[in-house]
């Protein structure tokens, strides 16, 4: 049975289309076949080409026109089946159309475009996961973990002057956030959320999701807009997740932990055919940037999305009272595992009126007009077998629990974090000895995602069970563990330079998505390079060449008849190619890759924006670092301490000698009109998005700040500016409108 636009992959037929159609096709001796039976009613064709009426046909001599007509019919069939639940052609007719389309594209390759129906499940399309900016930022949502917190959110609305607003309630899908960009009705890009500003391009893989249309279909009430960003969640239904894991286990591969992880993994496959086999679905829950369409209400936008052929939920409700919201939350929670065929972890409540949404605005991370109610995490009892520890890339030693396999929140869990030694002592969880049972513990999936142990079930504790004794030495190198600072809850291995465990983790991290993003340098490769002594540490990574990789068996293949000795494998060559590409990443990624404590993507960007080069960062004092927007004293101290170690400095020097970019390029043709100035932009501008305004400030030498203070030089005020404009007036900071902002950008303060 279809629910919410999703049809299980084991429905009738190859595409799930029942054979009850009246459409037909008749082969023609003199020309091509055009399908004009049921299911072709929405195809626009010239009268001389197609005879109107069920079960008829006509000959089209122009292959481009024939291709266009058949492609539209296939898209129509998918739309009717997956979205309207009203199929009009059967399996055989669908297959004949697809085969004819494939034959046309074989004969005329120029017809094989990325949005052709044959590319949905056909040959692999190149997917390199390049990054692109969202046209409008994808915000997060503030969470509420109790009805009282929802009531507090509602009270804030009323304090802001919003009286008795209509409230839209919808299920919170536990999936992967996605942003679809349609231009003139055509799907041109699909991006993951990423950091909210920039996402990964997964267009080729999203096009294999059968419920996602490649072209939008307009109606009289909802014409197709010139441009629209469609936000939603990609998910893997629970049944499909279980089938996938069964197949992985049968193939001797590791299963996915939960449906969300499997959805994310499926969407990031390099081969779209693998993604196509995973039965992914999507639910749309909003729009971002748009041109040619402006909804009056969130529910109005959802009506438009459905009319355009996009998958929406049938569980959306608009209520007029807070009591109605609480009833929706209670009702959905009682049917949490049956209400839809995919996992949910809460309810999202939104002010329905779009004008009110604009008026309420957003905080730095989330809209004030929406709240996500999270259901209480599921808790189960599990048998604790032992407590193990591992060492991370910064030397932090983390204990984790090993349990009997336990089902919780739809996943089978065997390991759960215990955070640090202090938490083990505080919770007093006790493992057993060899052959002896340990504590029965309360296992919870915090946020329905991360498994954690709340504590022991004391009534079930075996008599005489002793407390866990934490190790005093590193599990990898045997070095005595230390506190970084007095009172630190973490224990760390101070042997940062030589500890094998830290080395492996750091080399692996260098290649991670938030650092250099080097495909082919995973954990197995990091271990292989270190074990073969091809590299001594992460500083040697960019010095790798073919001769070096030949010393690591993982990157070699057996010689052919005319070859002597082991040869570099294709994976080895790809790694070298990817290493070469990675040398040109932005400075913030290089900073993150150094594994400096507290320096993640946010701090890395802040440092790169402020100083522009590695040399400038190394030359800066702790006070100068701390004064940078988004840095502060803790990060500044960590950076200074890191560069005091000669072997750390040598890593940077090695990378620089190998050609890694150590400074961000700045367009010298752009006048530095804002050098030394701090500018805050608040509210909506006509000609600037939030990100483009920030970039305009940074490129002219200014600092784009997020809050108003006495150090702020100018505040740019757009529509629905909010409290920042008020604070600027209180502090006497000059306030500019958009026209004044443009003048400031062009000529600096002197031009005002």
Curated annotation (Swiss-Prot):
Gene3D superfamilies: 5' to 3' exonuclease, C-terminal subdomain, 6.20.10.30, BRCT domain, DNA ligase/mRNA capping enzyme, Helix hairpin bin, Nucleic acid-binding proteins
Cross-referenced InterPro entries: BRCT_dom, BRCT_dom_sf, DisA/LigA_HHH, DNA_ligase, DNA_ligase_AS, DNAligase_adenylation, DNAligase_N, NA-bd_OB-fold
Species lineage: Bacteria, Bacillati, Actinomycetota, Actinomycetes, Propionibacteriales
E.C. designation(s): 6.5.1.2
Catalytic reaction equation(s): NAD(+) + (deoxyribonucleotide)n-3'-hydroxyl + 5'-phospho-(deoxyribonucleotide)m = (deoxyribonucleotide)n+m + AMP + beta-nicotinamide D-nucleotide
GO MF term list: DNA ligase (NAD+) activity; metal ion binding
Keyword Kinase: no
Entry similarity comment: Belongs to the NAD-dependent DNA ligase family. LigA subfamily.
SUPFAM superfamilies reported in the protein's UniProt record: BRCT domain, DNA ligase/mRNA capping enzyme, catalytic domain, Nucleic acid-binding proteins, RuvA domain 2-like
Name of the protein in question: DNA ligase
Pfam families from the UniProt entry: BRCT (PF00533), DNA_ligase_aden (PF01653), DNA_ligase_OB (PF03120), DNA_ligase_ZBD (PF03119), HHH_2 (PF12826)
Required cofactor names: Mg(2+); Mn(2+)
HAMAP family: DNA_ligase_A
Domain BRCT stretches: 669-752
EC top class, as a word: ligase
Active site, UniProt feature: 172
Keyword DNA repair in record: yes
Domain of life of the native organism: Bacteria
Function noted in UniProt: DNA ligase that catalyzes the formation of phosphodiester linkages between 5'-phosphoryl and 3'-hydroxyl groups in double-stranded DNA using NAD as a coenzyme and as the energy source for the reaction. It is essential for DNA replication and repair of damaged DNA.
Region (Disordered): 1-25
CDD domains: BRCT_DNA_ligase_like, LIGANc
UniProt binding sites for NAD(+): 91-95, 140-141, 170, 193, 233, 350, 374
Single Gene Ontology BP annotation: DNA repair
Entry binding sites for Zn(2+): 474, 477, 493, 499
Keywords, comma-separated and alphabetical: DNA damage, DNA repair, DNA replication, Ligase, Magnesium, Manganese, Metal-binding, NAD, Zinc
Source organism (scientific name): Nocardioides sp. (strain ATCC BAA-499 / JS614)
Cellular component, GO annotation: cytosol
């Amino acid at each position: 049975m279809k629910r919410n636009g999703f049809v299980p992959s084991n429905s009738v037929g190859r595409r799930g289309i029942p054979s009850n159609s009246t459409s037909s096709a008749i082969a023609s001796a003199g020309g091509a076949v055009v399908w004009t039976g049921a299911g072709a009613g929405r195809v626009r064709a010239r009268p001389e080409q197609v005879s109107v009426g069920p079960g008829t046909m006509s000959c089209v001599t122009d292959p481009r026109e024939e291709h266009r007509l058949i492609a539209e019919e296939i898209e129509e069939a998918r739309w009717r089946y997956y979205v309207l639940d009203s199929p009009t052609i059967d399996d055989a007719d669908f297959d004949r159309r697809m085969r004819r389309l494939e034959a046309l594209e074989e004969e005329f390759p120029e017809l094989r475009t990325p949005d052709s129906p044959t590319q949905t499940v056909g040959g692999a399309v190149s997917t390199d996961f390049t990054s692109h900016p969202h046209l409008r930022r994808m915000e997060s949502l503030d969470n509420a973990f109790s009805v009282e917190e929802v009531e507090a959110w509602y009270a804030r609305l009323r304090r802001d002057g919003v009286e008795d607003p209509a409230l839209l309630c919808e299920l919170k899908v536990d999936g992967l956030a996605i942003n679809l960009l349609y231009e003139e009705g055509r799907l041109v890009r699909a991006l993951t959320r990423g950091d909210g500003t920039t996402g990964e391009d997964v267009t080729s893989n999203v096009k294999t999701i059968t419920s996602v249309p490649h072209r939008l279909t307009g109606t009289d009430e909802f014409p197709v807009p010139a441009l629209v960003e469609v936000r939603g969640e990609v998910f893997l239904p629970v049944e499909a997740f279980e089938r996938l894991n069964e197949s992985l286990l049968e193939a001797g591969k590791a299963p996915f932990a939960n449906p969300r992880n499997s959805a994310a993994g499926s969407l990031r496959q390099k081969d779209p055919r693998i993604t196509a086999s995973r039965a992914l679905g999507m639910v749309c829950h909003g729009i971002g940037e748009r041109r040619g369409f402006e909804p009056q209400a969130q529910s109005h936008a959802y009506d438009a999305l459905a009319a355009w052929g996009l998958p929406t939920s049938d569980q959306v409700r608009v209520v007029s009272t807070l009591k109605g919201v609480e009833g929706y939350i209670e009702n959905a929670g009682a049917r949490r595992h049956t209400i839809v065929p995919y996992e949910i972890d809460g309810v999202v409540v939104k002010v329905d009126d779009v004008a009110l949404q604009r008026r309420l605005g957003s905080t730095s991370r989330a809209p004030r007009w929406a709240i996500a109610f999270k259901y209480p995490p599921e808790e189960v009892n599990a048998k604790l077998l032992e407590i193990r520890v591992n060492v991370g890339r910064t030397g932090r030693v983390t204990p984790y629990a090993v349990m009997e396999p336990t089902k919780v929140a739809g996943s089978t869990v065997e390991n759960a974090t215990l955070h640090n030694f202090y938490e083990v002592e505080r919770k007093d969880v006790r493992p057993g000895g060899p052959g002896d049972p340990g504590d029965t513990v309360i296992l919870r999936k915090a946020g329905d995602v991360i498994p954690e142990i709340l504590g022991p079930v004391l009534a079930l504790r075996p008599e005489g069970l002793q407390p866990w004794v934490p190790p005093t030495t590193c599990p990898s190198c045997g070095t005595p563990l230390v506190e970084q600072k007095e009172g630190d809850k973490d224990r760390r291995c101070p042997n940062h330079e030589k500890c094998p465990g830290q080395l492996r983790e750091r080399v692996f991290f260098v290649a991670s998505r938030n650092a250099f993003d080097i495909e082919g340098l995973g954990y197995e490769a990091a271990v292989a390079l270190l074990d073969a002594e091809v590299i001594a540490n992460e500083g040697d990574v960019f010095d790798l060449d073919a001769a070096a990789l030949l010393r690591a068996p993982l990157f070699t293949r057996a010689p052919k008849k005319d070859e002597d000795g082991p040869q570099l494998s294709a994976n080895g060559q790809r790694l070298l190619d990817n290493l070469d590409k990675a040398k040109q990443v932005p400075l913030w990624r290089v900073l993150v890759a150094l594994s400096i404590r507290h320096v993640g993507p946010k701090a890395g960007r802040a440092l790169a924006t402020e100083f522009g080069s590695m040399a400038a960062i190394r030359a800066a004092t702790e006070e100068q670092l701390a004064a940078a927007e988004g840095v502060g004293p803790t990060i500044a101290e960590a950076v200074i301490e890191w560069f005091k170690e000669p072997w750390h400095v040598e890593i940077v020097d090695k990378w620089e000698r190998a050609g890694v970019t150590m400074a961000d390029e700045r367009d010298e043709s752009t006048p530095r009109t804002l050098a030394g100035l701090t500018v805050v932009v608040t509210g909506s501008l006509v000609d600037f998005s939030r990100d483009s305004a920030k970039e305009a400030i940074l490129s002219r030498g200014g600092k784009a700040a997020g809050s108003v203070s006495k150090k702020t030089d100018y505040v740019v005020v757009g529509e629905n500016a909010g409290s920042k404009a008020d604070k600027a007036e209180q502090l006497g900071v000059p306030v500019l409108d958009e026209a004044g902002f443009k003048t400031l950008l062009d000529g600096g303060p002197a031009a005002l």
